[in-house]
Amino acid sequence: MSLVCFGEALIDFLSDGKQPESFTKYAGGAPANVAVAAAKLGLNTSFCGMLGDDMFGHFIKDELDQHSVNTSYCRFTDAAKTALAFVSLDESGERSFSFYRPPAADLLYSVDDFDHAMFANHAIMHVCSNSLTEHNIYQTTIYGLTQAKKAGAICSFDMNLRENLWPSMRHTLDRMWHVISLADIVKLSFEELEFLNQKSHQEMPLEHTIDAILKAGVTCLLVTNGGEAISFYHADFKGQVSPPATKVVDTTAAGDAFIGGMLSKIGQHCENKQSFKAFCQTPANIEQTIAYAAKAGAFAVSRYGAFASLPSAADLAEEC
């Protein structure tokens, strides 16, 4: 199987935490991170998105190329610059962000920019919610997912909510639920599950929102909770997997490493959506996939940066 990740690629300027403070440039952006994570673990992977025709956009493309990610679906524009994120870390490695977006190049990818061969050539399509923040890129994302679904692809969605990237939260829920209705795999943090539950179902138990996600057609829902157990939900069963203990220095790409690990493992075991659904009928298959993904996430948080912190298959084999 092969994977295409659609959405934003940006520059993370990571603080050194010293005084006077300085920042180091890293290629990043959640979908781009997932593409690199999966490629480093051996999956045939592409990135699809709009980059600024500037020094940062070309730096990102070069970084993707160097990590064996196919960039033939990338486009460049001079109508906006590549997005920037300044990232500060606290003592536990947790992040705080200051974004220079919008305007940004990634928001300008349109339906006409898609190479439709992409939908026929990739068995998994992955997106995040940062490509839902404005109307045009939301419409493009929905179009891409719809075309992928028509082609029989597995659709993966990581909510990865960044409220400060939304001009208004007025449309957030409707857009999230629209993507969930197209997804086969959904990954949320516990805080994101609480957000969905509070905004959608108010005082109802969290299980109400979990049931709604599964009834929307999602095959596998994953809920992470920092270093706590990872919960998974299927229409017929649920379970938990404990992640490995690790020293956290930077959580920048933790969730993306997790998703990349999960999708790479699915790509190894499944040939198409039908075999994916059959694979997910066995709890042990999901548990083993999550355990592998959790190892990838644990590796990433023990190192700085995004692409640079993502493990190879050999790295994870050494961790065993």
Predicted regions and their residues:
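Structural alpha-helical scaffold elements that stabilize or flank donor/cofactor-binding regions
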Residues: 117-118, 178-179, 214
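Conserved phosphate-binding/catalytic region of the ribokinase-like
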Residues: 4, 146, 201-320
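Short beta-strand scaffold segments in enzyme catalytic cores
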Residues: 36, 84-88, 229-233
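Glycine-rich phosphate/adenosyl-contacting loop at the front of the ribokinase-like
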Residues: 1-70
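Short glycine-enriched, charge-decorated loop/helix-capping segments at active-site entrances
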Residues: 19-25, 199-202, 279-280
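Conserved N-terminal subdomain of the carbohydrate kinase-like
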Residues: 44-127, 318-320
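Conserved beta-alpha-beta core of the PfkB/ribokinase-like small-molecule kinase fold
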Residues: 130-208, 218, 228-229
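Short, conserved phosphate/pyrophosphate- and ester-handling motifs at nucleotide-, phospho-/glycolipid
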Residues: 38, 189, 255
